[in-house]
Regions:
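C-terminal transmembrane-bundle signature of multipass membrane proteins
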Residues: 1, 12-24, 150-241
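Juxtamembrane "helix-exit" motif on the non-cytosolic side of transmembrane helices
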Residues: 1, 63-76, 133-145, 198-208
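N-terminal topogenic module of multi-pass integral membrane proteins
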Residues: 1-90
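Transmembrane alpha-helix entry/boundary detector in multi-pass membrane proteins
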Residues: 4-15, 79-92, 115-124, 137-158, ...
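Canonical alpha-helical transmembrane segments
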Residues: 20-36, 98-108, 160-169
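Membrane-interface helix-boundary motifs at transmembrane edges
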Residues: 34-46, 106-120, 170-180
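Alpha-helical transmembrane segments of multi-pass integral membrane proteins
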Residues: 48-65, 87-103, 119-136, 153-164, ...
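Alpha-helical transmembrane segments and their immediate juxtamembrane interface regions
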Residues: 93-110, 228-239
C-alpha cells in the first residue's frame, strides 16, 4: 500500500511499526559498548566506490534544485525571498558535498591523501540537510493525510543527526572509537531513505506522479546518498573491536 493512500487506522499502524523499527534499530546500535574508529581505511566494501555513488546522489540533488530554481524564476512562483535563498544554499551545499564525497573516495584509494584536511567541506552535508529541513518546514503537513511528507521530514532529521556525527568523527583523534550515535543515525538514515524511495517508486508505477517529479528525483538522490551512509556504518561494524 502507498504511504500516500494511508488513512485512518492504517496511519496509526504505520506509525506504530515505524516507532517499533526505530526502537529496535536504536537498541541494536546502542547495545554495543565500543566500535572501531570511524575512518579505518581498511575498507571491506570498496568504500571508495560507495563514496562516489554518494557523490552522485548529491550531484543529482544539485541539478534537481538548479532546475527547480530556474523554473521558479521563470514562472515567478517561488514562495518568498527567504525560500529562494534557502534553496540556493541547499543547491550550493549539495554541489560542495558532492566534491567532498569524491575526496572521501580518493582517501580510500590513496593513503597519502586525507579528506579530513578539508576543514570547511566537512560541514557541507550537514548544511545541506539543515537547509532541506528549513525548506520542508515552510509547508504545513498533517500527520494523518501527509504520511509520505512526514517520512521525508523524519529522513531529513536523521540526515542532520548523521552528518553532524560524520563531521564530528572527522575531528576525532586517530584510533578513537566511533560514536554509537554515528552508527545509530547511519542505520536510521539508510533504512528510512530506502523506504522513502520505494514509496516514490510505487507512486510512479501507479501513475500518481511523473518521472520528473521533484520529490521523486530527491528520493533517488537520498537512495544514492544512503548507499554511502550504509556502507560507512557497515565499515565501522566490520572493523568492530
Amino acid at each position: 500500500m502507498l504511504l500516500f493512500d494511508l488513512s485512518g487506522f492504517t496511519v496509526t499502524i504505520f506509525y506504530c511499526l515505524l516507532s517499533a523499527a526505530v526502537a529496535a534499530t536504536a537498541y541494536n546500535a546502542l547495545r554495543v559498548k565500543s566500535y572501531s574508529q570511524a575512518f579505518n581505511f581498511r575498507s571491506h566494501f570498496h568504500f571508495d566506490i560507495m563514496s562516489y555513488i554518494g557523490a552522485l546522489g548529491f550531484f543529482i540533488d544539485f541539478v534537481n534544485r538548479c532546475v527547480g530554481i530556474y523554473n521558479s524564476i521563470e514562472s515567478t512562483e517561488y514562495q518568498s525571498r527567504l525560500y529562494f535563498i534557502v534553496q540556493c544554499v541547499a543547491c550550493t551545499a549539495a554541489f560542495l558535498s558532492s566534491l567532498y564525497l569524491v575526496a572521501v573516495g580518493i582517501s580510500f584509494n590513496d593513503l597519502n591523501y586525507d579528506f579530513r584536511q578539508l576543514k570547511v567541506f566537512r560541514f557541507m552535508p550537514l548544511l545541506w540537510s539543515i537547509a532541506l529541513i528549513l525548506l520542508v518546514m515552510q509547508d504545513a503537513v498533517s500527520f494523518e493525510s501527509n504520511v509520505d511528507e512526514i517520512l521525508k521530514q523524519i529522513l531529513l532529521v536523521c540526515g542532520v543527526c548523521f552528518f553532524y556525527r560524520f563531521a564530528s568523527e572527522t575531528l576525532a583523534q586517530d584510533n578513537e572509537s566511533a560514536g554509537r550515535a554515528t552508527v545509530l543515525f547511519g542505520r536510521l538514515y539508510s533504512y528510512i531513505a530506502a523506504v522513502y524511495f520505494i514509496d516514490r517508486l510505487m507512486l510512479l508505477f501507479s501513475q500518481k506522479t511523473a518521472v520528473s517529479d521533484f520529490d521523486g528525483i530527491f528520493s533517488v538522490s537520498a537512495l544514492l546518498i544512503c548507499t554511502f551512509v550504509f556502507f560507512f556504518e557497515r565499515n565501522i561494524v566490520a572493523n568492530e573491536n
